[in-house]
Amino acid sequence: METITSRDNAKIKYACAVRDTEKQRAADGVFFAEGPKLCLELAKSCTPRVVYATAAALVKTPELARFDPAEIAPHVAEKLSGTKSNQGVFALFETPVPPADILNTARRILALEGVQDPGNVGTLLRSAAAFGFDAVVL
């Protein structure tokens, strides 16, 4: 496996575009995730299109090997993260498409719009699960 060492690599630029622009995410049906825990958890229900990881992250999280990750240099990880302190794992996942009839068959639906704080979304999702909601629309 060859390590991606250029911050100007086309694949890295594309991942940054997905991370930064809703238009890119919507057009390609993908979303960006960062961090080993989040990426492994998302992989249980979403299809990873590509996974990027530093050598250190691959040693720390050997479970990532099943996704055939592209190895990236630490300075490339900084570009993907936008920070110097990151966990070195990034992925693009296919956006799941809910069944077309979900709004007709679900009995309890939580609809969220314009929630500013991601922590509030997490709280609302956990509450919806605890109260037996069938669907959440973001």
Question: What spans do the regions from the language model cover?
Answer:
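Structural motif
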Residues: 32, 52, 90-92, 109-111, ...
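RNA substrate-binding interface of SAM-dependent RNA methyltransferases
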Residues: 44, 102-138
